[in-house]
């Protein structure tokens, strides 16, 4: 963070440990004299000592939790040298630090246990293989309407330019809202307003990735997976958790989800995005420009038929707009990450699909009676 430590990068475990120690020492200062003997205060003293690695004097003077400037060795002459404690006031200057400390503790950001080999889109590719010719590619939906109790979808073959119509008992619409708002439909006004509100709430997310011809973050800095955070525009650098100790590797050189920064990066040329990401990465890893190669960027707001990374409804829209989409419009049902409280996650899309299928099955059974 440019606002703290003179802009020098810091190891997360050190800052986390010193934050806990500094906060625990402040809290311990509020204990009543003689807390060692009294019941509740004695228990609180024990809690704070364990939480913050405080000494018997209830002060924080650094901890092995923060790591070592010189790691412990084998002989009595090599006990290891701990890092000195970072001043709590200096830690507090880092504007990005609150979100960093809480990130891994939020309910949807637990430590990753499994990941699909080949990238997250491996899941979509597996569905495509299973469905085979059922999928019609290059088919652009241009209209959705009710025809009695059924639905009619109008679509255009993008390769041949020909128009087509498909009638169905039910339609599961997973089209992202920024795209859906421009498709002709006979949805009622509350549904159209909800679609428009959601379309405005999409995050213009941006990612930048680089290839590295050697895994210098492992060999030079002992980084094996994980994330570096920065107050600069790139927001994060992700280090690969696969292919450890290999020859080459792919770094995620930027992951941007702040609307203003995302729009600014989206307006850049691909070449300019790479240059901006390298300049910011240089602050974390001096010599970065010579360590990365073959960059690529994706600005989701620029991707056709997507219009953004994911929706971020926010409390007002959750209450005012989202409910209008929950029950769909007759035979038309909506599904996707935007139809869940797990926005941006594939799990949200899958759960919403399950819910829609259950509603369709229930409706089909009621018709059969």
What spans do the regions from the language model cover?
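FAD-dinucleotide binding site
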Residues: 1-369
């Amino acid at each position: 963070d440019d606002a703290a430590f003179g802009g020098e990068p810091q190891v997360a475990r050190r800052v986390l440990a010193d934050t806990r120690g500094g906060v625990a020492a402040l809290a311990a200062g509020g204990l009543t004299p003689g807390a060692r003997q009294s019941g509740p205060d004695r228990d609180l003293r024990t809690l704070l000592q364990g939480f913050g690695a405080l000494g018997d004097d209830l002060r924080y003077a650094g901890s092995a939790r923060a790591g070592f400037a010189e790691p412990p060795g084998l002989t009595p002459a090599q006990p290891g040298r701990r890092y000195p404690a970072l001043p709590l006031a200096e830690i507090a200057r880092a504007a990005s630090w609150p979100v960093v400390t809480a990130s891994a503790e939020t309910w949807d950001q637990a430590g990753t246990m499994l990941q699909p080999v080949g990238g997250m889109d491996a899941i979509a590719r597996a569905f495509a293989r299973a469905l085979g010719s059922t999928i019609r590619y290059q088919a652009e939906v241009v209209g959705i309407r009710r025809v009695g109790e059924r639905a009619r979808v109008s679509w255009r073959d993008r390769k041949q330019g020909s128009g087509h119509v498909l009638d169905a008992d039910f339609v599961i619409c997973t089209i992202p809202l920024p795209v859906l708002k421009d498709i002709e439909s006979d949805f009622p006004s509350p549904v159209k307003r909800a679609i428009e509100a959601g379309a405005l709430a999409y995050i213009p997310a941006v990612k930048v990735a680089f290839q590295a011809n050697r895994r210098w973050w492992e060999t030079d800095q002992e980084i094996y997976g994980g994330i570096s955070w920065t107050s600069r525009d790139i927001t994060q650098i992700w280090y690969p958790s696969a292919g450890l100790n290999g020859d080459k590797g792919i770094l995620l050189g930027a992951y941007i989800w702040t609307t203003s920064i995302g729009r600014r990066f989206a307006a850049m040329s691909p070449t300019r995005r790479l240059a901006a990401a390298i300049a910011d990465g240089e602050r974390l890893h001096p010599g970065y420009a010579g360590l990365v190669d073959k960059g690529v960027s994706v600005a989701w707001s620029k991707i056709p038929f997507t219009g953004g990374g994911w929706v971020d409804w926010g409390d007002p829209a959750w209450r005012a707009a989202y409910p209008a989409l929950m029950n769909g419009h007759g035979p038309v049902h909506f599904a996707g990450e935007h139809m869940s409280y797990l926005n941006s996650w594939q799990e949200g899309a899958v759960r919403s699909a399950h819910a829609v299928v259950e509603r369709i099955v229930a409706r089909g059974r009621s018709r059969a009676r």
